[in-house]
Every structure is written in C-alpha cells, then in structure tokens.
Amino acid sequence: MKKIALFNHQPECSIECCNGIIRALSSQYEVKLFTIQDDLDEVLNDVDGIVFPGGIGDSDSYHDFFTRSKANKIAAFLDRGGRYIGICMGAYWAGSRYFDFLDGIDAVQYIKRPTAEIRRSYGTVADIEWLGQKEKMFFYDGCVFTGSGYYDTIAKYANDEPMAIIQGNLGLIGCHPESEEFWYESPYQ
C-alpha cells in the first residue's frame, strides 16, 4: 500500500478536512499525519505523496509554517518523483505566493474572477463539472487556475474555468471533494 503524508495543523488546516481526506483515501493509501513540529526529512523519507488540505490558512500562516528551507525540501521531494495534492488552501499554497510549484499558471481567488457565479468567500455549494459529470461540491473561498502553462483540467466551475487540475505531479482542487455531509448544512453555508 502506498503511503501519503497529510499536513495537519489546527486551526489553519481544518481537522474536518483532514478527517474527510483520511476517510476518502485510507482504503488505498496509508495516511501519515504530520505537523510543523515534525522533521520534514523524516516525513518525506518514506512517502509517495504529500497532501495539504483546506482550512483557514493564508499567507501569514504559510510563512509561519514553511521557511524557504522547508519549501525547498518539498520541492526536492517533487523533483524525486513525489506527488503533491492540494485541496483549497493546499491548492493555493502550490501557487506563486507560497511554494511556487506551478509552471506558467497560478492559483487565484475564484470569487474575484469577472465571470464567477460565487461572489462571497463564505461556505456554499458550487456547481461544477468533474470529468464531464455535473456535480455540486462544497466551496469555501477556493481557487481557480489561470495562465498559459500546460495542465490537464479535471473539473471546471460553472463559468468553465478550471477548478481541479493536474500539472506534472501536482494534483490541485479548488473546492472540497473530501467534504462531509454535515458541511452542507447550516451554519456552514
């Protein structure tokens, strides 16, 4: 069974996001949780991928967690063939203001796009198309991917902009496919 490392730091990385990811992936992957206190070399030593979940993290919390040295260790892990999964906040963190892993594209705030049908950052349900199938997915100030670099679009928002992409060994998702059923109930919307 392949092993993935899942970043967990309350409250910036929601424990609910981590629990949803564990439930979704634990039948196919051994999930190893890690925090900012863990030695990143040890964390990355025996895993196939690293996962950064959603949460309330922003640029301030990112820079509190990840020095350039730690970011370089993750970049070296990717260069060795490791995989990166970023959901919502984790997808933003792959962008130019943070880890800077994307090539020719960036992760930007969806609600600020001129044709976005969602205009506020609070939790709601987004209409998306995932591999050609219409779906509804939990959205909480997620990102969209812009730019001229090459990537494969896995899912799109209602305005046809990319919501989930694969670029090389990065898998990035703006919404929350790991969402639990209760997320769709008040007060989360």
Can you annotate each of these PLM segments?
Residues 57-58, 62-128:
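A glycine-rich, often tryptophan-bearing local segment used as a flexible ligand/cofactor-contacting loop or short
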